[in-house]
Amino acid sequence: MTDSTRDGHASHSLHGGVYPGNLFMVVAPSGAGKSTLVNALLSKDSDICLSISYTTRKPRPGEQDGQHYHFTTVEDFRARHAAHEFLESAEVHGNYYGTSRVWIEEQMRNGHDVLLEIDWQGALQVKKQFRNAVGIFILPPSLDALEERLKKRGQDEPNVITRRLLAAGSEIAHASEAEYVVINENFERALAELECIVAATRLRFASQYARHTELFIDLGVHLPHAE
């Protein structure tokens, strides 16, 4: 999820928008603990908004429409895709997922940080449009641990678990494309590392400038010229 293009702007959209809010992308293979970590982070940090994706997959036990996902039909998803409503979209394990562009840009324009739970393919799509989006890859401590977590979760049939484990290898190979990597062996440590990443991002010059532009101008501090 890295990009060789760098400039002094925070959350710089290729469509011309420069927003004070930061965009975080959390990527992980199924079973690595991504959702649990993200939920814990959100419960401690009210300044981050979770982007709720659209999906054509069936709800899992306990999932609610509009809270965990916007559950929709294949026909509706394709219509939204044709209308360019999605910032990114992908097919994962036979189901479609998409992220609302309008909602994200509105939140960031108003100074809110936005977090995406996303796969690596979607993260690359987002990075092409928001060059300073921050990619965070969650890794399991081992493939054996990943398999054990998938079994304990009790949500998938054995053949689905096998398919997820096979996919995990190719997904993990893209960890090098992220700006940050968190190894989720100890939950509390992994959560603390996520919090550190968020805090460090907010303190970057570009983020501080976008949030406090008038102060920086009054002090005579200006953005560096893009190369």
UniProtKB/Swiss-Prot annotation:
User: What GO annotations for molecular function exist for this entry?
Assistant: ATP binding; guanylate kinase activity
Localisation: Cytoplasm
Enumerate the InterPro entries for this protein: GK/Ca_channel_bsu, Guanylate_kin-like_dom, Guanylate_kinase, Guanylate_kinase_CS, P-loop_NTPase
Q: What is its EC number?
A: 2.7.4.8
Give the CDD domains listed for this entry.
Answer: GMPK (cd00071)
**What SUPFAM superfamilies does the database record attribute to this sequence?**
P-loop containing nucleoside triphosphate hydrolases
Pfam families assigned to the protein according to its UniProt record, in alphabetical order: Guanylate_kin
S-adenosyl-L-methionine found in the keyword field: no
The record lists the catalysed reaction(s) as: GMP + ATP = GDP + ADP
**Binding-site residues for ATP, renumbered to this chain:** 28-35
What's the gene? gmk
Per the UniProt entry, the disulfide pairs are none
The record's HAMAP family line, in alphabetical order, gives: Guanylate_kinase
User: According to the UniProt entry, where is the signal peptide?
Assistant: none
Q: Which PROSITE patterns match?
A: GUANYLATE_KINASE_1, GUANYLATE_KINASE_2
Its function? Answer: Essential for recycling GMP and indirectly, cGMP.
Q: Which GO terms describe its cellular component?
A: cytosol
Keyword flag Transferase: yes
Q: What is this protein called?
A: Guanylate kinase
| Keywords, comma-separated and alphabetical | ATP-binding, Cytoplasm, Kinase, Nucleotide-binding, Transferase
Q: Which residues form the Guanylate kinase-like domain?
A: 21-199
Family (UniProt):
Belongs to the guanylate kinase family.
